[in-house]
Each structure stands twice: as structure tokens, then as C-alpha cells.
């Protein structure tokens, strides 16, 4: 019920506010569950925190919401230190996976609940409710009860209730995990549209679903064992992950043994010995002679060169799996298994065929072991 209270009593926002976590630390009964974490979410930004169960991502969100008392560090929303403020004074709203709608109230009354708790004028309440329901595409369902709605519709109502109070910050705690795949896909598109319509809203989105994070977030933070192990702009983090865990958690990745040979004349590219060949790959820094790992996404491999600078691996096809629009190939490259995903392959290669796997230098990333 506290989660309802947060949205209900969040004071109306003026302007935009970001979130700053300054060495935030959380411990339960002396056991540290969140190691000192510093992170800035810019005003109007969508940041997705992802990670496996128990990684600490929900702990971060609950600390920002005010449901968990930090053992150290500070939490700022805008210019206000909210570390020791109760949830209802933080100017935020929260949406959780079980919707938390009042079953005895109509949709319009659920959406109006927070505004009435704020003792807003009736005319303003009606205006905000109408606008919020329109924003989430639920105007025609205003007089229905929650049990008359699908799961996706109930989640839209929960989001409408949250945005109706005009919070500075919106917290989303795995809001789509209880929905089936198709409805979840549609809701991801709806949340993306919502943020386009409300660009001033700062969103912290916690999920274990990489697709949701990649679709919605301006930036992504990856959690593991209570630590933030990677953080950056979504595209950059996907294409150039800093470590193996980030590479494999944020989409499929081929991880191959490699040795850095030295820098090249092209900034950011290094010569690498990998897969029985000397290739060029992207690197965050200058490396020479160190054992490294090479990360290549399956979809970045092709059977034909894309440029005069394309890298090449010689491979033997191990298996072919046709899945409609996509064909998955497993290949042996110098004793290591490499997966590739292709579209419009005709004719299909056969198991045992010798193949050349091509990829661009910037699509191969040197990472730490």
C-alpha cells in the first residue's frame, strides 16, 4: 500500500528534476546488499537498471522511493537531498508489476485518487484525469472497474494514476513482467510514446528484460552482486560493452579468446590475434601483448564483406536453424563456437561447409577477461 501512497501524495512538479545517487549504500541486518554506488540520471532522461535477480537493481529503486533507508550516501532529486525524507515528500510516483489498483473504484476514480489526496480543486482533478487517460489511450474505459480490464489495460491505468499527479520522477519496477509477450511488446511501445509526450519526466526503469531496456532507455546501468558494473548510453553500451558480463547480459554475444598486438593508425582500433587470424577491433584503450576477449554480436557477422576493411574468419558450419525471418548458424572458428544470425539466406549453407565470416572492425570489441 505504501507504493500507492507515493503516487497519491507526490506534490505537483514544476519543471524537471534529475536523480543523483552519491555513494549510496544499503545493508540489511549488517549484510551489504548494495555497495557504494554513484549515478546521475539527467532531468528528462530514461535510465533502465537491469541485472539478474538479487543484483541490487530493485534495492536502488526502493531507496530512491524512500522504502529502504540507506546505510550510507545521499539521494538527491533535483537540488533537494531526499535521503531522509518520507516517500510522500519526494515528488515522485511509482508503478509496480501488480498494478495496485483499488478494485472497488472505477478507472477514473483510481486515476483521481492521488489528486484527491492532494486536495486539488475538482475542476483540476477532472482535467488531469481526462488528460492522463487520454495519454495512455484509456479514455473509453473511464467508468469501468479494474476487474473488467485486461492486464495491459490495468497497467495503463496504473501509469495514468502515476502521471496525473505530475511527479518530478517516475519509478517503474518491472511493470510489464506479469503480462504475456504480445501485450508486453505493445506496452513497451506505449511507454516509449508516453515519454515522447512527457519529455520532461525523469524515469528510472527497473527490469530484467533486455529488450525493454534497449527499446526505452536513453542510458542503461547493469547491476551484478550489488554493484553497478556498467553504465552508459544505450547504443554505446550495446555495441561497445566494457566487460564480458555486460556483453552477454545485454543481448547475445560471441566471446572469443584474443591477444592484443598493438595500436593501429586508426584511433580506437587495435590489431588482434583471434580465431586463427589477425584482425582489427575496437578497444577502449591501448593494449599490447595482453590476453583479452573479443566480443562480436551474432548479427554483425555476414557471409559477404561489407567494405574493403572487413575482417574475416575462416569457419566450418556446425548446424543450421531456420526460424522464419531469421537463420541461426553455429560455426567452428579455430576450435571455438561462433553464432551468427542472418536474414534472407538463399540457398542455405549445409553442415560441414567451409565459410568465410565477415565483420567490420568497429563491430568487434576487445574486452577484459
UniProtKB/Swiss-Prot annotation:
ATP binds at residues 51-58. It is a peripheral membrane protein. It is found in: Cell inner membrane. One of its GO terms (cellular component) is ATP-binding cassette (ABC) transporter complex. It comes from the Bacteria. Keywords: ATP-binding, Cell inner membrane, Cell membrane, Membrane, Nucleotide-binding, Transport. One of its GO terms (molecular function) is ATP hydrolysis activity. The keyword Signal does not apply. Belongs to the ABC transporter superfamily. 2-aminoethylphosphonate importer (TC 3.A.1.11.5) family. This is Putative 2-aminoethylphosphonate import ATP-binding protein PhnT. The gene is phnT.
Amino acid at each position: 500500500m505504501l507504493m500507492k501512497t507515493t503516487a497519491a501524495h507526490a506534490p505537483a512538479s514544476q519543471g524537471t528534476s534529475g536523480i543523483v545517487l552519491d555513494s549510496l549504500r544499503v545493508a540489511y541486518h549488517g549484510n551489504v546488499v548494495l555497495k557504494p554506488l554513484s549515478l546521475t540520471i539527467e532531468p528528462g532522461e530514461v535510465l533502465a537498471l537491469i541485472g539478474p535477480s538479487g543484483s541490487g537493481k530493485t534495492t536502488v529503486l526502493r531507496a530512491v522511493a524512500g522504502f529502504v533507508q540507506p546505510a550510507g550516501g545521499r539521494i538527491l532529486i533535483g537540488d533537494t537531498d531526499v535521503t531522509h525524507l518520507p516517500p510522500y515528500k519526494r515528488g515522485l510516483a511509482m508503478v509496480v508489476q501488480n498494478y495496485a489498483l483499488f478494485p472497488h473504484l472505477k478507472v477514473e476514480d483510481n486515476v483521481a485518487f492521488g489528486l484527491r489526496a492532494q486536495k486539488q480543486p475538482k475542476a483540476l482533478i477532472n482535467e488531469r484525469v481526462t488528460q492522463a487517460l487520454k495519454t495512455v489511450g484509456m479514455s473509453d474505459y473511464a467508468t469501468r472497474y479494474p476487474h473488467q480490464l485486461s492486464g495491459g489495460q490495468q497497467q495503463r491505468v496504473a501509469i495514468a494514476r502515476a502521471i496525473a499527479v505530475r511527479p518530478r520522477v517516475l519509478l517503474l519496477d518491472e511493470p510489464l513482467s506479469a503480462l504475456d509477450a504480445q501485450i508486453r511488446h505493445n506496452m513497451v511501445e506505449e511507454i516509449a510514446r508516453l515519454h515522447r509526450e512527457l519529455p520532461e519526466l525523469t524515469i528510472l526503469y527497473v527490469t530484467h528484460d533486455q529488450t525493454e531496456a534497449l527499446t526505452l532507455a536513453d542510458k542503461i546501468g547493469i547491476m551484478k552482486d550489488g554493484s553497478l558494473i556498467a553504465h552508459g548510453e544505450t547504443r554505446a553500451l550495446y555495441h561497445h560493452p566494457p566487460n564480458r558480463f555486460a556483453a552477454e547480459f545485454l543481448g547475445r554475444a560471441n566471446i572469443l579468446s584474443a591477444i592484443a598486438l598493438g595500436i593501429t593508425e586508426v584511433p580506437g582500433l587495435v590489431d588482434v590475434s583471434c580465431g586463427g587470424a589477425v584482425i582489427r577491433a575496437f578497444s577502449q584503450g591501448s593494449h599490447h601483448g595482453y590476453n583479452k576477449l573479443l566480443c562480436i554480436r551474432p548479427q554483425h557477422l555476414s557471409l559477404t564483406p561489407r567494405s574493403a576493411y572487413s575482417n574475416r574468419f575462416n569457419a566450418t558450419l556446425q548446424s543450421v536453424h531456420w526460424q522464419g525471418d531469421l537463420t541461426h548458424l553455429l560455426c567452428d572458428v579455430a576450435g571455438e563456437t561462433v553464432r551468427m544470425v542472418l536474414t534472407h539466406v538463399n540457398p542455405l549453407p549445409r553442415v560441414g561447409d567451409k565459410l568465410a565470416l565477415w565483420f567490420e572492425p568497429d563491430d568487434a570489441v576487445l574486452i577484459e577477461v
